[in-house]
Amino acid sequence: MQDLYQLIGEKLNDIIPGEWTKIYLYAEVLDDSTMVLFHFRTPENNQIIYSQDIPSHYNVSKDIFKTLLRELRELFEELRTEHRNNNDDVWTNLTLTLDRSGEFQLDYNYDDILASELDGYERIAIWEYKNLGILPEDEDDKEFVISYLGL
């Protein structure tokens, strides 16, 4: 599995065309779907950039970006398969934090997210607040996160 962690780190570095100091990644891998998104900090003003903004922010081809992101999703699918093959509990989502020095932390979540009252957007909004302190721009979504977390 260590090799997979290394490949994931290298793929993230390939996807981000500029300098970064820390990456915050959310991956959700189920039997029939996979979603991976991340934010990263840059050295300039400690700015946080959302992964989906890379093509516009760095003038990168959307096709190349989508290909790299698909390859990243496949690595997380492989990681989940490795856990399953090793008779480990099968996780449904995870948070990965990675700093420029290569230090990383993985937090696996084993909740049955399909049975959760939260939809995918709500899970992401809560994750973004807990990990980055970012509230949604939409007022209704912001109120949901505040209410759900009891802020």
From Swiss-Prot:
Chief location? cytoplasm
Give compartment(s): Cytoplasm
Q: What induces it?
A: Expressed on rich and minimal solid media likely in early stationary phase; dependent on DegSU. Not expressed in liquid LB, but only under conditions that promote biofilm formation.
Which keywords does this chain's UniProt record carry?
Answer: Coiled coil, Cytoplasm
Supply the Pfam families for this chain.
Answer: YezG-like
InterPro entries (alphabetical): YezG-like, YezG-like_sf
Function as written in the Swiss-Prot or TrEMBL entry:
Immunity component of one of 6 LXG toxin-immunity modules in this strain. They promote kin selection, mediate competition in biofilms, and drive spatial segregation of different strains, indicating that LXG toxins may help avoid warfare between strains in biofilms. Mediates intercellular competition during biofilm formation; disruption of the operon disadvantages the bacteria, but overexpression of the cognate immunity protein restores growth in competition with wild-type. In situ neutralizes the toxic effect of cognate toxin YeeF.
The protein in question is named: Immunity protein YezG
> What is the organism field in this record?
Bacillus subtilis (strain 168)
